[in-house]
Amino acid sequence: MNIDKGWIEEAKILKSPNFDERNNEINLIVIHSISLPPSKYGSNNIDNLFLNKLNPLDHPYFKKIINLKVSSHFLIERTGVLKQFVSTEDRAWHAGESSFKGEDNCNDYSIGIELEGTDNSEFEKAQYSQLIKLTQTLMKKYPKIKKE
């Protein structure tokens, strides 16, 4: 994989408005799981959430989250498709109130990767394969990220 100005060339780019300037060095990758609606896969609902285009009429659950302004740097779909929403040079809004090793605000110094799925279901081999390539690329670009 190639990264240029914070963008992975092999990723499908969908630019989210939900980001701001990053003022800290990157030293962490945060991996989340997401599905919208919960436990449902294979739609554009996650994209629409990160792009502020989620339609609250499409599912009752969406009425609860319609006002969220969130994003992630990356999404890896069940099929292994890699999407990027925010440049790694910018701060995505993926971690909310958070801390790592006593340092608050993980968004300030981390890259967020979403895997389409849930905490109680298995991920797909294609997702793991893509995740390995992506994390290797990011760790090469940002050497302060350590395996932990």
Describe each model-derived feature in a short phrase.
Residues 1-22, 28, 33-144:
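Active-site-adjacent loop/helix surface patches within enzyme catalytic domains
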